[in-house]
Amino acid sequence: MEVLPKALEVDERSPESKDLLPSQTASSLCISSRSESVWTTTPKSNWEIYHKPIIIMSVGAAILLFGVAITCVAYILEEKHKVVQVLRMIGPAFLSLGLMMLVCGLVWVPIIKKKQKQRQKSNFFQSLKFFLLNR
């Protein structure tokens, strides 16, 4: 028959087991979860909510204007220059890239607004459920 090993002493534990933290309470699990905590009541500012689409739209608009400038310069200069051919290829590329980023930012804003409304409804129903169940 096999002999079962004795329980390991504290000093004999592997280094990986020393790194693990002991489980504490259910509330600590809620706090460490990836989702936003229901317990936080501080509302986010508009900048915190919309900063990513604003940055994408700003960069897209800058690239779009750069593409417009390059394209205009390419068609104003005479075709004798070798640089003109390169500018005529790069200009429309910047135009399309800038327009794409600008449109992505513009589409992102209504998506965030819809998500915020759903989150508000969800928080309302969670608080209502909490109120009704704890009577």
Curated annotation (Swiss-Prot):
Q: In which tissues is it expressed?
A: Strongly expressed in most dorsal root ganglia (DRG) and trigeminal neurons. Expressed by most peptidergic (CGRP+) and non-peptidergic (IB4+) DRG neurons. Weakly expressed in other parts of the peripheral nervous system (PNS) including sympathetic and enteric neurons. Not expressed in the spinal cord.
Q: Which residues cross the membrane?
A: 54-74, 92-112
Predominant location category: membrane
Specify residue ranges for compositional bias: Basic and acidic residues: 8-19
Stated name of the protein: Phosphoinositide-interacting protein
Gene name of this polypeptide: Pirt
UniProt-annotated location(s) = Membrane
User: What function is annotated for this protein?
Assistant: Regulatory subunit of TRPV1, a molecular sensor of noxious heat and capsaicin. Positively regulates TRPV1 channel activity via phosphatidylinositol 4,5-bisphosphate (PIP2). Binds various phosphoinositide, including phosphatidylinositol 4,5-bisphosphate (PIP2), but not phosphatidylinositol (PI).
Q: Where is this region: Disordered?
A: 1-21
* InterPro entries for the chain: PIRT (IPR028068)
Query: Quaternary state and partners of this protein?
Result: Interacts with TRPV1.
- Effects seen without this gene: Mice show impaired responsiveness to noxious heat and capsaicin. Noxious heat- and capsaicin-sensitive currents in DRG neurons are significantly attenuated.
Q: Please give the GO cellular component terms listed in this UniProt entry.
A: plasma membrane
One Pfam family of this chain: PIRT
Annotated membrane topology: Multi-pass membrane protein
Give me any GO biological process, just one.
Answer: response to heat
User: What keywords sit in the KW lines?
Assistant: Membrane, Transmembrane, Transmembrane helix
Q: Which GO terms describe its molecular function?
A: phosphatidylinositol bisphosphate binding; phosphatidylinositol-3,4,5-trisphosphate binding; transmembrane transporter binding
